[in-house]
A protein has these predicted regions:
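Glycine/threonine-rich phosphate-binding loop and adjacent beta-strand/alpha-helix elements that clamp
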Residues: 447-456
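Short beta-strand to alpha-helix junction loop
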Residues: 191-209, 221, 388-396, 423-434
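Extreme N-terminal leader/targeting segments of oxidoreductases
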Residues: 1-129, 268-286
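N-terminal cofactor/phosphate-binding cores enriched in small/glycine residues
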Residues: 141-165, 172-178, 196-206, 210-212, ...
């Protein structure tokens, strides 16, 4: 298959609002961000692939995109290679179909210019100066890349035998990310994701690839557990006591200690009376037994947060029964691209046209982060403060309520009161959902645990 045909196949299914941004930069023609080429605002967390255009406009945009990309690949320079902050805000506003604040320009500029990440100048580091980083998970790797790029001597202490942190530990069925893969990754380290929302295995592989690509493992001490850190005021240094896999202990010294240990370890167990004497099998999802089968088991799942959203649907068809105990309900948003593979054509486009990949990621950043910001401000004159913050937030409530009711089906009458939060949408972290409402068999507040069963 020719390069032209591969590009044509990819552009035929590509995201229209993203293609428009590529068109503007490649051609310098700003008619692509004016009517009739302004996408309509997308709903929810969807990618808005069609942009809300009819087939004729979509074809015009796709044809123009193919021509512009082929010209660029043939040597035509990018007409608008470095848009100003103001131009970037204008472009993103058009692409999203809604007003993007002016202050977003600087971040957009940085995001679009960070691949690959380059350090123009090394930091002038005093002789003997060194940094200790605790943890080689997501934060630890990002810190290590930055320190290495700046020329600052450092050492990473990691208690596991490999990098990736929580994505090495969390091995429960269905473990994955509920942020889009192309957003849940470093801007300086793009990746050929196979799924729109990656599962644990691919996430671990990604962070391992970052460590390899930036040659970080030479600076990581694996199977090294930090026991304590103590600041020495007289020398303005830190003493870091560590234990190695062979049982030996050592005290290290550093000018700076950066903790990237994360918040998910060790696992937090609920304070339930009788938990320590429960005679049945029990474990925390963060310590899931490798290869454990739940076939024909009566299972109780305590908690209904993000982990439960992933675990419940994964095991519901294996177990004899599944009962969910919750402290309180959460708002959930549809998770339409969960377990959806990125088409090979789009993976090719991401690889061959960096502008497309970067603008796609930039749009995701707006959709999943700042889009709802204005709707989170409390309206002092709003007539329904008992259920929402303002009119927009109330429309969010109606949408999510309707979604829950639809998913519960004929169980809506008896479960709706139990799964519907009383606080406003986005009052807590939103949970992404594929089919968890359908998984629910009961929702009760856990108060104590007997030797054989939960009691409430």
């Amino acid at each position: 298959m020719t390069d032209k045909q591969q590009l044509a196949d990819a552009i035929a299914i590509a995201n229209i609002p993203t293609l428009l941004m590529v068109l503007v930069q490649l051609t310098g023609d700003k008619r692509w961000i004016a009517d009739p080429y302004r996408p309509k605002r997308g709903s929810g967390t969807g990618d808005n692939d069609s942009g809300g255009f009819d087939e004729a406009i979509q074809k015009e945009i796709r044809d123009a995109s193919l021509a512009a990309i082929l010209a660029w690949k043939a040597g035509e320079p990018v007409a608008l290679e470095t848009p100003s902050n103001e131009e970037l805000v204008e472009m993103l506003t058009s692409s999203m179909g809604e007003k993007v604040p002016a202050e977003y320009g600087e971040m957009t500029n940085a995001q679009l210019g960070q691949t690959p990440m380059k350090w123009e100048d090394k930091i002038d580091v005093p002789e003997g100066f060194n940094v200790i980083v605790i943890g080689a998970g997501v934060s630890g790797l990002a810190t290590a890349v930055s320190l290495q790029g700046a020329g600052v001597p450092f050492k990473v202490l990691e208690r596991r035998s490999n990098v990736a942190g929580v994505w090495q530990d969390n091995r429960y069925p269905g473990a994955g990310v509920d942020t889009p893969s192309h957003l849940y990754s470093f801007s300086f380290a793009p990746y050929d994701w196979s799924a729109y929302f990656a599962l644990r295995g691919e996430l671990a592989e990604y962070f391992e690839s970052v460590a390899d690509d930036f040659d970080l493992k030479k600076s990581i001490e694996f199977e090294t557990n930090v026991i304590s850190t103590e600041y020495q005021a007289d020398t303005q240094t830190w003493k870091v006591k560590v234990a190695h896999a062979d049982g030996s202990e050592e005290t290290l010294e550093a000018n700076v200690v950066i903790s990237c240990a994360g918040i998910f370890n060790p696992p937090a167990f609920p304070n339930i009376q009788g938990l320590d004497s429960f005679a049945g099998e029990s474990w925390h999802t963060a310590e899931w037994p490798e290869g454990k089968s739940l076939d024909n088991k009566k299972v109780i799942m305590i908690g209904n947060g993000a982990t439960a959203m992933q675990l419940g649907p994964e095991i519901q068809n294996q177990v004899e029964s599944l009962t969910i105990f919750q402290r309180g309900p959460h708002w959930v948003s549809p998770f339409e691209q969960f377990r959806v593979d990125v088409p090979e054509e789009i993976r090719y486009l991401f690889k061959e046209v960096p502008l497309y990949r970067m603008w796609y990621r930039m749009r995701l950043g707006w959709i999943y982060n700042d889009r709802v910001y204005d709707s989170l401000h409390k309206d002092p004159n709003w007539e329904h403060p008992e259920r929402s913050l303002n009119a927009t937030n109330d429309s969010h409530r109606a949408y999510f309520t309707s979604y829950m009711k639809k998913e519960l089906g004929d169980r809506a009458d008896d479960l709706m009161d139990k799964v519907l939060p009383t606080f406003p949408p986005f009052g807590k972290r939103m949970l992404m959902d594929k089919s968890s409402p359908k998984t629910a068999t009961s929702t009760k507040l856990t108060s104590s645990l007997s030797q054989r069963a939960l009691t409430c």
